[in-house]
């Protein structure tokens, strides 16, 4: 539930920041954008689009694709770093789940507000002592750096002179495109589906809402904007899938091994409650869970070795 809340908060934060940065670029009565983000990043991007479209004779559709690819390649390391931080924190939380289970059980079974508050405090203390944080993997700085680029290319794709009257593969870039909207929805659904791979079944059930939320959001935005913007989101969706593939099948396995090695060398300590109503049984369970983590990881590694030999 906490990871679901974290993802919802992260998505809400991303959307809020997108709207905030969109507000930084205003459009005057003549239909010309202005503002700090536009003057700093948007104008150079618009000039690049014009250069590829008119001076190189590639057309505005291809020009938008090229500039979008350039921008996404530039900020891809930031996106991967953000994914690395979030995945590292998630793997650590998964590793510590058996250790925190007795506390979570007390939290679920709490009958009074006092008991619930005590369990929550104990859980947060245990997480803090082991270097864990519910929001530690969000990484706001990389997102803050990326958002101006997203905002600038959004307006460059929409307001570069000549784009609204251009066509690309039979699509009028100045009008809405149902075809691109459907493709974008599929791309972002695939990206959301990939993010659920390798996730425990229990957590996967909690993430189902998020799997549909992003495609729905993209449909509503794409269907109300010109095809030039949808074309930018189409390329962005491809890059999102690439980033998610790297995260799911490259970063996560490496981080899982890294976490296992870290806590094999330095086994995590069981948290001891300091309150007066200390439950000896739960303390024993925590200690047993602490040992169970190491035993479970060793068993999984031995099983993997036997499979490879077979």
UniProtKB/Swiss-Prot annotation:
Its main location: membrane. Residues 1-23 form the signal peptide. GO terms for molecular function: membrane insertase activity. It is a multi-pass membrane protein. PROSITE patterns: PROKAR_LIPOPROTEIN (PS51257). It is found in: Cell membrane. The keyword DNA-binding does not apply. A lipid is attached at residue 24 (N-palmitoyl cysteine). Residues 266-310 are annotated as: Disordered. InterPro entries: YidC/ALB3/OXA1/COX18, YidC/Oxa/ALB_C, YidC/YidC1/YidC2_Firmicutes, YidC_ALB_C. Residues 281-297 have a biased composition (Polar residues). The chain crosses the membrane at residues 33-53, 58-78, 135-155, 180-200, 219-239. A lipid is attached at residue 24 (S-diacylglycerol cysteine). Residues 298-310 have a biased composition (Basic residues). Pfam families: 60KD_IMP. One of its GO terms (cellular component) is plasma membrane. GO terms for biological process: protein insertion into membrane; protein transport. Keywords: Cell membrane, Chaperone, Lipoprotein, Membrane, Palmitate, Protein transport, Signal, Transmembrane, Transmembrane helix, Transport. Required for the insertion and/or proper folding and/or complex formation of integral membrane proteins into the membrane. Involved in integration of membrane proteins that insert both dependently and independently of the Sec translocase complex, as well as at least some lipoproteins. Belongs to the OXA1/ALB3/YidC family. Type 2 subfamily. This is Membrane protein insertase YidC 2.
